[in-house]
Amino acid sequence: MFDAAPIKKVSVVIPVYNEQESLPELIRRTTAACESLGKAWEILLIDDGSSDSSAELMVKASQEADSHIISILLNRNYGQHAAIMAGFSHVSGDLIITLDADLQNPPEEIPRLVAKADEGFDVVGTVRQNRQDSLFRKSASKIINLLIQRTTGKAMGDYGCMLRAYRRPIIDTMLRCHERSTFIPILANIFARRATEIPVHHAEREFGDSKYSFMRLINLMYDLVTCLTTTPLRLLSLLGSVIAIGGFSLSVLLIVLRLALGPQWAAEGVFMLFAVLFTFIGAQFIGMGLLGEYIGRIYNDVRARPRYFVQQVIYPESTPFTEESHQ
């Protein structure tokens, strides 16, 4: 077994999108958790194009005396995982922890993740206990987790929880990947030699509403299906073969019945023919739509456009500066 490098510095990466109500409490509690580690630490807040005063609060926190907070401002909303990747590109720690800004996963769990990673794990995931989400969110999460487990073969219990710890080599490897649709927990587990999970507390959301609407969850499902595997395309080929064989068999059967029962029966079977035809057409459209998803993602990857555009980075006790597009 390989000995893992000691953890000397911890970086906490937090994507922020319209979280002005929770930010002061988030910063206070995360700072307190990091101070208890007995290691060097930093907090990176990434504003993902917020329309409220989240960015102003972040900048103010970075400019306070003895601040350990780095604020990264994106020029618009790129999504949670793109914002986290923007944070990854600015970390300096040996262990990187991701955390949502809504305080549903308590920052007080950070020392437990660090302690577990100190045992030599490359990735430390978490499983939310007594989830305080709606039935719809819980059901969608179960479906997504089952889909990921079946596709990747890695039996992690809760891929949807972003409270996770990654060692620096895993982060550096993910930054070298250039997929447009990135689901960080899965990508990290692909490269991790040793991964584990620990149970964590899950609190009810105190401020605002979830940023994952029904349509965003549907889009996430499409992202997972098309970025993880080509199995759906193989299933389409199998389905096409079954339909072709079924259609040929049905044609033979109809010809035999036509000859046996006469032309009167043929007229009575028109509606059945239409039903079969519409079934085949529906299957074709489903296949075309799924194939289009794959082609669209290939097109986006070939264009190689940046995943995000960093507008400003504010370091503690430093002057804000403007950057070019990154990653």
From Swiss-Prot:
Its EC number is 2.4.2.53. The chain crosses the membrane at residues 236-256, 270-290. It is found in: Cell inner membrane. Residues 1-235, 291-327 are cytoplasmic. GO terms for biological process: 4-amino-4-deoxy-alpha-L-arabinopyranosyl undecaprenyl phosphate biosynthetic process; lipid A biosynthetic process; lipopolysaccharide biosynthetic process; response to antibiotic. InterPro entries: ArnC_tfrase, Glyco_trans_2-like, Glycosyltransferase_2, Nucleotide-diphossugar_trans. GO terms for molecular function: phosphotransferase activity, for other substituted phosphate groups; undecaprenyl-phosphate 4-deoxy-4-formamido-L-arabinose transferase activity. Keywords: Antibiotic resistance, Cell inner membrane, Cell membrane, Glycosyltransferase, Lipid A biosynthesis, Lipid biosynthesis, Lipid metabolism, Lipopolysaccharide biosynthesis, Membrane, Transferase, Transmembrane, Transmembrane helix. It is a multi-pass membrane protein. Its main location: membrane. It comes from the Bacteria. Residues 257-269 are periplasmic. The keyword Lipid biosynthesis applies. One of its GO terms (cellular component) is plasma membrane. It catalyses: UDP-4-deoxy-4-formamido-beta-L-arabinose + di-trans,octa-cis-undecaprenyl phosphate = 4-deoxy-4-formamido-alpha-L-arabinopyranosyl di-trans,octa-cis-undecaprenyl phosphate + UDP. Pfam families: Glycos_transf_2. Pathway: Glycolipid biosynthesis; 4-amino-4-deoxy-alpha-L-arabinose undecaprenyl phosphate biosynthesis; 4-amino-4-deoxy-alpha-L-arabinose undecaprenyl phosphate from UDP-4-deoxy-4-formamido-beta-L-arabinose and undecaprenyl phosphate: step 1/2; Bacterial outer membrane biogenesis; lipopolysaccharide biosynthesis. Gene3D superfamilies: Spore Coat Polysaccharide Biosynthesis Protein SpsA, Chain A. Belongs to the glycosyltransferase 2 family. Catalyzes the transfer of 4-deoxy-4-formamido-L-arabinose from UDP to undecaprenyl phosphate. The modified arabinose is attached to lipid A and is required for resistance to polymyxin and cationic antimicrobial peptides. This is Undecaprenyl-phosphate 4-deoxy-4-formamido-L-arabinose transferase.
